[in-house]
């Protein structure tokens, strides 16, 4: 298989499948897909940076499934696009991240869905 064919096939993946591929590659090769930080030419004073920085990315963490585990699994599947087994494994392995690097509004919406299903949820 040529690199061009491989790129074409990867381009056909859904966003969820692509994220799973990245995670599998990170685990297999012991690397991270996070961008490498580049040193800035002129550093701003630390006080200014702290005042400007506001959290823009949030993570929804499933703390516990609660009593209605089946309902929580259904919600996790709809949120993540995972299969039944993967969603069940995520719920059984709580505390686990359900969604990462999302907006505050999306995090609150997902947390509400999970809480309505009976789960204990944390937004970080």
Swiss-Prot record:
Alphabetically ordered keywords of this record: Ribonucleoprotein, Ribosomal protein
Gene Ontology terms, MF aspect: mRNA binding; structural constituent of ribosome
Gene3D superfamilies associated with the record: 3.30.1390.10, Single helix bin (1.20.5.710)
Biological process per Gene Ontology, one example term: translation
Alphabetized InterPro entries for the sequence: Ribosomal_bL12, Ribosomal_bL12_C, Ribosomal_bL12_C/ClpS-like, Ribosomal_bL12_oligo, Ribosomal_bL12_oligo_N_sf
GO cellular component: a single term: cytosolic large ribosomal subunit
Family: Belongs to the bacterial ribosomal protein bL12 family.
PANTHER family the record matches: 39S RIBOSOMAL PROTEIN L12 (PTHR45987), LARGE RIBOSOMAL SUBUNIT PROTEIN BL12M (PTHR45987:SF4)
Record's protein name: Large ribosomal subunit protein bL12
UniProt organism field: Chlorobium chlorochromatii (strain CaD3)
